[in-house]
Amino acid sequence: MCIRDSIKTLPYPGFPTDMQPQIAVALCLAEGTSVITEGVWDSRYRYVDEIHRLGAQIQVDGKVAVIEGVDRLTGAPVQACDLRAGAAMVIAGLAAHGTTEVDQIQYIERGYEDIVRKLSGLGADIRVVVTPEEEKAQASVG
């Protein structure tokens, strides 16, 4: 179980803004209320709508996100809207009960080399599924 916390992202050597979406996933499963204050960037909470699909309870007001811990996340289709949000969706999907499908994985693949192989090597049940539409699009490009 994760312990609730309050975090404020800051420039180095403070808590890194690039880790904010991933830590938010952990705090979604913490007991109680946690608060994240984004002290570096505007619009860093774009992932929140996606993680809501998994059952997370996050309310955003400006640069502050209030997270109410839930007992479990439940698998659902989600999208990676950027690199860090994509990593957060993968983490949330691995923690969720049931299947989570992450779309727009090009963001994740751009920033995390061999992430599927590495996570599988750690025991994660994760794989890339290419849809017929994606296969057709790839064939027409190459």
Indicate where each model-derived feature is located.
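Short, structured segments at the rim of ligand-binding sites
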Residues: 4-142
